[in-house]
C-alpha cells in the first residue's frame, strides 16, 4: 500500500508538471519576465539619445586625436611628406630631360 501512495504522489506531481508545460525551478512562480522582444527599440532615421558622459567622451577623444595628428604633422612632417630633398630643376641636364642637342639636325 505504501508503494501505491508513493506512486500516486509521483503521478500527481508529474501531472502538474505536464499541465504547466515546463518544469518549475525554485522561486520561479511560473511567470517569465524576460520577454522575447527587443530591449532597445530601434528608431528609423533618428539619432540615438546620448548621455552627457558619452558626448563628453566623444569630444575629448576626437580632440585628442586631432591634437595628435596635427602635433605629429607639425613636428614630424617628413613622415607624411617624405624626407627626400626636393630636386632643383635648374641643375637638370638636357640629356636627363630628353631634350636633343642644338647642333643635331
From Swiss-Prot:
Q: Where is the transit peptide?
A: 1-33
Which GO biological process annotations does it have?
mitochondrial respiratory chain complex I assembly
| Start and end residues of each stretch annotated as Disordered | 85-105
Output the InterPro entries linked to this UniProt entry. Answer: NDUFB2_animal
Keyword Cytoplasm attributed: no
Instruction: Please give the chief subcellular localization of this protein.
Output: mitochondrion
Is Cell cycle a UniProt keyword of this protein?
Answer: no
Compartmental location: Mitochondrion inner membrane
What keywords does the record list, in alphabetical order?
Electron transport, Membrane, Mitochondrion, Mitochondrion inner membrane, Respiratory chain, Transit peptide, Transport
A GO cellular-component term linked to this record: mitochondrial inner membrane
Membrane topology, as annotated, equals: Peripheral membrane protein
- Entry's Pfam families? NADH_B2
Q: Where is the composition biased (Acidic residues)?
A: 93-105
Q: What does this protein do?
A: Accessory subunit of the mitochondrial membrane respiratory chain NADH dehydrogenase (Complex I), that is believed not to be involved in catalysis. Complex I functions in the transfer of electrons from NADH to the respiratory chain. The immediate electron acceptor for the enzyme is believed to be ubiquinone.
The Swiss-Prot or TrEMBL record describes its family as follows: Belongs to the complex I NDUFB2 subunit family.
What is the protein's quaternary organization? Complex I is composed of 45 different subunits.
Q: What is this protein called?
A: NADH dehydrogenase [ubiquinone] 1 beta subcomplex subunit 2, mitochondrial
Question: Which species is this UniProt entry from?
Answer: Pan troglodytes (Chimpanzee)
Gene from which this protein is expressed: NDUFB2
